[in-house]
Amino acid sequence: MENIKVDVIIPAYHPGKEFSTLIERLTKQTFPIHRIIVMNTEETYWNKELEEKFSILEVHHLKKQEFDHGATRAWAAELSDADVMVFMTQDALPADKSLIENLVKALTEDEKTGAAYARQLPNENCSFVEKYTRSFNYPDRSAVKTKDDLPVYGIKTFFCSNVCAAYKRDIYQKLGGFVRKAIFNEDMIYEIGRAHV
C-alpha cells in the first residue's frame, strides 16, 4: 500500500471558505497525497492565494460553458498519473485524517474492486428525510456490491458518490472512464458499466 500514488481531483466553481478547510484537511491525511488537481470553472472566481498557501495544488481553469460533470472529471483523470484517483466535490470535508488511507485500503483489499466511496454524514440541522437518505446510501458498515446484489439493492447496487469516491486508474482506463456528456450521475453511469464487465 505504501507505493501507491494518490491524486485528489476536485471540480470547483466559486469555492468559498470551506474549500480552504477541505484542502487543509487533505494535506493532513495519514496517507500521502501526491497532488490535488482542481478543475476550476471561471478563473475570475479563483482565489490565487490558495496556490501560494498550498503548493500541492495544481489548478486548471475552464469556462462555464466547458464544464460538464463527466467531461471535466474525465479531463482531470487524463492529467493524473496516480494509481488511485480520488474525486471530491468542493464542499466535501473529511471527518478525520484517515479518509484517503481508508479509501486506498478498500481498493487494495480485493484486486477486482475498482471503486470505493466514502460515507457522507448529514449536517446536524438537516431534515429527517435527508438524514434517512444519508443513512440508506451511506450505512455505518462497509459493503462490497456486485451485479449479483441487484435483487437486494435494485438500482442502488450501482450507487457511487461523486462527493468523495476513489478509482483505481488501471480499471478506470480499461473501462473508458467517465462518459463525456453527463449533467449528473456520472459516477453511477460509470459503475453500471463496470458492473457489467
Where are these regions (language model features)?
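A conserved acidic beta->alpha catalytic loop
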Residues: 39-48, 92-93
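Cell-envelope/extracellular polymer assembly enzymes that use nucleotide-activated donors
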Residues: 4-7, 35, 189
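Short aromatic/hydrophobic "clamp" motif used to bind/position activated sugar donors
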Residues: 85
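Glycine-rich, basic loop-to-helix element that forms the pyrophosphate-binding segment
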Residues: 63-80
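Short, well-formed alpha-helical segments that are part of the catalytic scaffolds
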Residues: 15-28
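A recurrent flexible, glycine/aromatic-enriched loop bordering the glycosyltransferase active site
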Residues: 147-167, 183, 189
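Short beta-strand/loop segment that forms part of the nucleotide-sugar
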Residues: 33-43, 62
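Conserved donor NDP-sugar-binding/catalytic core segment of glycosyltransferases
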Residues: 93, 97-131
